Curated annotation (Swiss-Prot):
Pathway: Carbohydrate degradation; glycolysis; pyruvate from D-glyceraldehyde 3-phosphate: step 3/5. GO terms for molecular function: phosphoglycerate mutase activity. This is 2,3-bisphosphoglycerate-dependent phosphoglycerate mutase. Belongs to the phosphoglycerate mutase family. BPG-dependent PGAM subfamily. The lineage of its organism: Bacteria, Pseudomonadati, Pseudomonadota, Betaproteobacteria, Burkholderiales.
Length: 247
């Protein structure tokens, strides 16, 4: 049996401001830093250790990984950054306030954009200053790999090749991994690991900064999963996350 740990980044400034974030590179709040440090302490107290950390190329996840490792006294561990662990791209909603969008388009439409499996928000124009297509960190990617919008289905489609090509082989070889990423890239992994249907994944929320531990068998199938710090605390945090703009 081996373990895999998934952690959503700590609270970001745009989580706090209820703005859709997506691929926009925003900071952690002081609360987010504290959540990341507490995640590290919880892992250390549970006796869970790692060989390698995987994270996205967005600093709210990178800094969460660093603060978590600091809390574990494991700052020397390698941290591998991969764009495929980025948050779902929110297209034309990025940077906008969820409540304002609900007033403009209606609660039902905004909920469809946020929570449906296969309906993306309106795309950005390629020349929109919010587009990441000129961002140097994505310079080696083909233009069509840098999205202008995504639904969760699209996020799953980019996360699963990373799982099959890199993460799963590393785990099968005995590597102990922690993945520090985002609400929707983690939902993509959870959907795959637990074989959750397209309909049921809509109701799954991932709390900020609380380690989700999977026990995996030799075939990398889950035998159990649990949140450190208790299920009640995780459920309460997830309910708060569900009310915030995604990202």
């Amino acid at each position: 049996m081996t373990q895999l740990v998934l952690i959503r980044h700590g609270e970001s400034t745009w989580n706090l401001e209820n703005r859709f974030t997506g691929w926009t590179d925003v900071e952690l709040t002081p609360t987010g830093v504290a959540q990341a440090q507490q995640a590290g302490r919880l892992l250390k107290q549970a006796g869970i250790d790692f060989d390698t950390v995987y994270t996205s190329v967005l600093k709210r996840a990178i800094w969460t990984a660093w603060h978590c490792l600091d809390g574990m006294d494991r700052t020397w561990l390698p941290v591998i950054k991969d764009w495929r662990l980025n948050e779902r791209h929110y297209g034309g909603l990025q940077g906008l306030n969820k409540a304002d969008m609900a007033k403009q388009f209606g609660d039902e439409q905004v909920l469809l954009w946020r929570r449906s499996y296969d309906v993306p928000p309106p795309p950005l124009e390629a020349n929109d200053p919010r587009s990441e297509r000129s961002d140097v960190r994505y310079a080696k990617l083909a233009a069509n790999q840098v999205p202008l919008t995504e639904c969760l289905k699209d996020t799953v489609a980019r996360v699963l090749p990373l799982w099959y090509g890199t993460l799963a082989p590393a785990i099968a070889a005995g590597q102990r991994l922690v993945i520090v990423a985002h609400g929707n890239s983690i939902r993509a992994l959870v959907k795959h690991l637990n074989n959750i249907s397209d309909a049921d994944i809509v109701g799954v929320n991932i709390p900020n900064g609380i380690p989700l531990v999977y026990d995996l068998d030799a075939n990398l199938k889950p035998t159990s999963k649990y949140y450190l710090g208790g299920a009640d605390a995780a459920a309460q945090a997830a309910s708060v996350s569900a009310l915030q703009a995604d990202g």
